UniProtKB/Swiss-Prot annotation:
It comes from Xenopus laevis. It comes from the Eukaryota. The keyword Iron does not apply. This is Xenoxin-2. It is found in: Secreted. Disulfide bonds join C3-C24, C17-C37, C43-C58, C59-C64. GO terms for biological process: defense response. Keywords: Amphibian defense peptide, Disulfide bond, Secreted.
Amino acid sequence: LKCVNLQANGIKMTQECAKEDNKCLTLRSLKKTLKFCASDRICKTMKIMSLPGEKITCCEGNMCNA
C-alpha cells in the first residue's frame, strides 16, 4: 500500500492516486487520518500495536477523500 494522504497536527498532504490504483483505504485514529491507495476493492480491518483496532473503508475516485 502506498500512503497518499497524511493529516496530523494540522498538516495535510494530498496526492492523486494512479489510474490503476484508484481505490483508497482510510485509516483513522484520534489525531491523524492515513489514506492509502489499493488496487483491489476489498476492505480490510487493520490492527496496530500502539492503537486499538481501526476500521479501514474504501472510497471511490482518483483522489482520497476524508
